[in-house]
């Protein structure tokens, strides 16, 4: 009886070791185990998803192409990243968004003004 118990313990240990090894190899070579979540997929490299969102957007006035904000005039469009960009309205009724300046205050505004004058 004692030999049978020892044999069953050894068999159980062997089976659990073999099972653990197969689980390791399955995980190493990309196998999916039950209960694991799949990683999210990258967005497609074409603009179809954006165009669908743009086509579904409703606006009575002007729909900003980069933020999909509905405004009265194109130069009222907000910048997509207001924490990182400064907005400048141009005399032609348009606006541009420029990355905020680095070290000096109002550096982006100074560079836009230099560009308007043709000095940059």
Swiss-Prot record:
Residues in coiled coil: none
Matches recorded under InterPro entries: LCL2
Any one GO BP annotation for this protein: ERAD pathway
Keywords, ordered alphabetically: Signal
Domain of life of the source: Eukaryota
Disulfide bonds: none
Leader peptide range in chain numbering: 1-20
Keyword Signal: yes
Family to which the UniProt record says this protein belongs: Belongs to the LCL2 family.
Summary of the function given for this chain in its UniProt record: Probable component of the endoplasmic reticulum-associated degradation (ERAD) pathway.
Record protein name field: Long chronological lifespan protein 2
Gene behind the chain: LCL2
